[in-house]
Curated annotation (Swiss-Prot):
Induction pattern: The upstream region of the gene contains a phage-associated promoter element (PAPE), which also includes the first 48 nucleotides of lscC and is essential for expression of the gene. Even though the upstream region of the gene is sufficient to promote expression, the expression level is enhanced by the presence of the 48-bp N-terminus of lscC. Expression is induced by the transcriptional regulator LscR, which is able to bind specifically to lsc upstream PAPE sequence. Transcription is temperature-dependent.
Positions bearing the site annotation: Transition state stabilizer: 219
Protein name in the entry: Levansucrase LscC
UniProt xrefs under Pfam families: Glyco_hydro_68
Key word Transferase present: yes
Keyword Protease attached: no
EC number(s) given by UniProt: 2.4.1.10
Organism of derivation: Pseudomonas savastanoi pv. glycinea
Gene behind this protein: lscC
Catalysed reaction, written as an equation: [6)-beta-D-fructofuranosyl-(2->](n) alpha-D-glucopyranoside + sucrose = [6)-beta-D-fructofuranosyl-(2->](n+1) alpha-D-glucopyranoside + D-glucose
Gene Ontology CC, one term: periplasmic space
């Protein structure tokens, strides 16, 4: 891990954040070569193929617990709340029937991203989730897809800011404000009617659609820096520049061993964890800052970045795929992490490689879209689990929760809990 200004120029002065002088931390190929998919301390337990499904009518994937700006997962009047990316299942739709008239769940599942909607669920137990419905009515969001973000409980009046991604056409970080109403019977999320687009990729720090038609720009996660008290946001991006124009230089290589100097087509993998700062705690105006971590020549996706603040350290987590790694290096689908003592870095890859929690090699696609909470619990969804022969079972439901122990720059897998167990760390009673 090193810092370099070769991929992204550093920022000298920010109108909103003040005098900032930092360079992105480079996740190098040498770091990634240390990834060990068979390390039991960073491997998620096997998910059984007889897993329960939380809904027969919808698929769910990215899960977003309701939280406060310091990361605390909250319940409201005793009700836990999660948001999920959601799409209807189509078992009777002729479009998803095979030649024998059987439901092709695999194709239905693979098509879900184009019809993703933000929905909510509630529970008294932190599991046994009850479906509440859509957060925004049809037509409220200005694009065809509602992709992942973060719901923030603002106060004890029940106001919620949902930061999310407006996708197709384009991709923009957006915010919509509503409120939560509870009763003895359940929960309603109401009045999420006015979406405000906050910013898009700028082409200077973050790659735009014009620079790369398969660019990544999504997954806002706002937080208050425990040191300076300002409101920031991390998000997924790609390092700016025309596709194929990036250089995998000495910093991006790192101290690789002999025989690993050839990077093939690694210049096409240009993932990064982006940063923005708000004008004030209202979160209405934002300024884009340079990336915190770049993965040029390593990986093209650093999805759903988010923080855990513990023991004076900044634990910055992200998720990524095996298929988005660059030529010559590999790693499992799962959680990757970086740790430092300051928001602006420098950061070090956790466990030397960056890998925190990966799928087991025998079930490489069992779970994804992990969210690490401040209590060490990690939630994810089930993608597909092998059954007999070459067959497998599609999930689209919550995976078993696991706990990880954070110890300095290292992490260790600990207990496994029930499917979709996302307990509140604090209950907020509405006034």
């Amino acid at each position: 891990m090193s810092t370099s200004s070769s991929a992204v120029s550093q920022l000298k002065n920010s109108p909103l954040a003040g005098n900032i002088n930092y360079e992105p931390t480079v996740w190098s190929r040498a770091d990634a070569l240390k990834v060990n998919e068979n390390d039991p301390t960073t491997t998620q337990p096997l998910v059984s193929a007889d897993f329960p499904v939380m809904s027969d009518t919808v698929f769910i994937w990215d899960t977003m617990p309701l939280r406060e700006l310091d990361g605390t997962v909250v319940s409201v009047n005793g009700w836990s709340v999660i948001l999920t990316l959601t799409a209807d299942r189509h078992p009777d739709d002729p479009q998803y029937l095979d030649a024998n008239g059987r439901y092709d769940i695999k194709r239905d599942w693979e098509d879900r991203h184009g019809r993703a909607r933000m929905c909510y669920w509630y529970s008294r137990t932190g599991k046994d989730w009850i479906f509440g419905g859509r957060v925004m009515a049809e037509g409220v969001s200005p694009t065809t897809r509602e992709w992942a973000g973060t719901p923030i409980l603002l106060n004890d009046k029940g106001d919620i800011d949902l930061y999310y991604t407006c996708v197709t056409p384009g991709a923009a970080v957006a915010k919509v404000r509503g409120r939560i109403v509870t009763s003895d019977q359940g929960v309603e999320l109401k009045d999420f009617t006015q979406v405000k687009k906050l910013f898009e990729a700028d082409g200077t720090y973050y790659q735009t659609e014009a620079q790369n038609s398969s660019w990544n720009f999504r997954d806002p996660s706002p937080f208050i820096d425990p040191n300076d008290g300002k409101l920031y946001m991390v998000f997924e991006g790609n390092v700016a520049g025309e596709r194929g124009s990036h250089t995998v230089g000495a910093a991006e290589l790192g101290p690789v061993p002999p025989g690993h100097e050839d990077v093939g087509g690694a210049r096409f993998q240009v993932g990064c964890i982006g940063l923005a700062v708000a004008k004030d705690l209202s979160g209405e105006e934002w300024e884009i800052l340079p990336p915190l971590v770049t993965a040029v020549g390593v990986n093209d996706q650093t999805e759903r970045p988010h923080y855990v603040f513990q023991d004076g350290k900044y634990y910055l987590f992200t998720i990524s795929h095996k298929f988005t790694y660059a030529d010559g290096i590999t790693g499992p689908d799962g959680v990757y992490g970086f740790v430092g003592e300051h928001l602006f870095g420098p950061y070090r890859p956790m466990n030397a490689s960056g890998l925190v929690l990966g799928n087991p090699p025998e079930q490489p696609f069992q779970t994804y879209s992990h969210c690490v909470m401040p209590n060490g619990l990690v939630t994810s969804f089930i993608d597909s689990v092998p059954t007999e022969g070459e067959d497998y079972r599609i999930g689209g439901t919550e995976a078993p929760t696991v706990r990880i122990l954070l110890k300095g720059d290292r992490s260790f897998v600990q207990e496994e809990y029930d499917y979709g167990y996302i307990p509140a760390m604090k209950d907020v009673q509405l006034s």
